[in-house]
Regions:
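Secreted, disulfide-rich extracellular signaling modules
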Residues: 1-355
């Protein structure tokens, strides 16, 4: 037997809300801006060097000749020919990836002086130079904490002319495969010249953005924790049944959607324990994936429907972008109040009566 929410005109409701993202959990860092979001990168360095060489840096006998940053793009939101331009500032307040969220942003202190030059951007590489004195200060601080300002790293902040958002894999401490590398050339005149490649040991992004105006759509947005909740009234569904399939289907509103590359082409669906607090049930680790095909995201939530029919309270479904930490995409679906009922979320349940 079958129950189709569209054919049976079942009551439903949908909406979206903003959760608080922990930026340190992302495996990607984003920089850039568009009409609804701006993203900046924080990176912190610890350059390991023998004490004997640090002492030479402090005394001015081991000199930083150049410092060049190279980063390999892995994500794009917007036109690839659009402008990406940013400034690099020295951070003067302590920060950590642990617990860094939108409430941490106002407490960030940085110098207003841009310490970067020679920025070049293409599809495969972002490259720029850092003032030699910046790295020299880091090394001097390592040698003697009283000889230079404390090193809290760098802030990469987009300029107003920027019209796209680009992402890079976040660095993993001690990994030899990191794709964000600062190459530092040091020289002891007439004696030695060395090149040291170092990656950030703290490497995160933070994104500030506008939450879209509440309308009839069900909208998701990466980087700011914009999630959705969806409820179907299944009181007309018999209790003593076995649910074989329950296909949940959402239609994309392409006019309100901006997707990136790689695409935010899946949604995670989890069962809610409380529709008000958005608390999840104890089996919240069980996630159903809604996959995209053409302009429709669909997945089988039969196990959720079965739990509700077995007596668990139907508080609805929590939905989120699969890549909400590593994307700035905005994906909009037609919601439960859309004037065109055929475009609203659909739930088609296939079941059999228990004998």
């Amino acid at each position: 037997q079958e129950l189709d929410s569209y054919q049976a005109n079942i009551f439903q409701k949908s909406g979206y809300y903003q959760d608080k993202i922990k930026f340190g959990l992302s495996n990607v860092v984003l920089i850039g801006k568009n009409s609804y979001a701006e993203s900046s990168i924080l990176m912190r360095y610890r350059i390991n060097m023998p004490d004997s060489l640090l002492a030479l840096v402090k005394s001015g006998k081991y000199i930083v000749k150049s410092a060049t940053m190279q980063m390999i793009p892995r994500y794009l939101l917007g036109d690839k020919t659009a402008n990406l331009n940013f400034s690099v500032y020295q951070v003067r307040s302590n920060w950590s990836p642990v617990g860094f969220d939108r409430d941490s942003i106002p407490h960030l202190v940085y110098d207003p002086i841009d310490v970067a030059s020679g920025l070049t951007v293409n599809d495969t590489l972002v490259k720029f130079n850092i003032k030699n004195d910046v790295v020299t200060q880091w090394l001097k601080y390592s040698a003697d904490s009283n000889s230079a300002p404390k090193n809290f790293g760098l802030l990469l902040k987009p300029k107003p002319s920027t019209k796209k958002i680009v992402g890079f894999y976040s660095a993993i401490p001690s990994s030899s495969k990191n794709e964000t590398v600062l190459s530092v050339v040091l020289e002891r005149p007439s004696i030695r010249k060395d090149t040291v490649g170092v990656s950030p040991f703290f490497h995160i992004y933070y994104l500030t953005g506008q939450v879209p105006q509440q309308n009839s759509n069900l909208t998701f947005q990466g980087g700011i924790g914009l999630k959705g909740a969806l409820f179907f009234d299944l009181s007309t569904l018999p209790k003593n049944i076995i649910v074989n399939k329950a296909f949940l289907e959402l239609n994309v509103d392409t006019t309100s959607t901006l997707d990136g590359n790689p695409s935010s082409d899946s949604l995670f669906a989890q069962i809610l324990a409380d529709s008000t607090t958005k608390k999840l049930t104890r089996d919240s680790t069980v996630v159903t994936v809604l996959s995209k095909k053409d302009k429709i995201y669909t997945g089988d939530v039969a196990w959720m429907v079965q739990k509700w029919q077995n007596g668990e309270s139907n508080q609805g479904i929590l939905l989120s972008l699969w890549d909400e930490y590593s994307s700035a995409a905005r994906i909009a679906f037609y919601g439960s109040k859309d004037q065109n009922k055929a475009l609203r979320p659909k739930l088609k349940i296939i079941y059999m009566q228990k004998k």
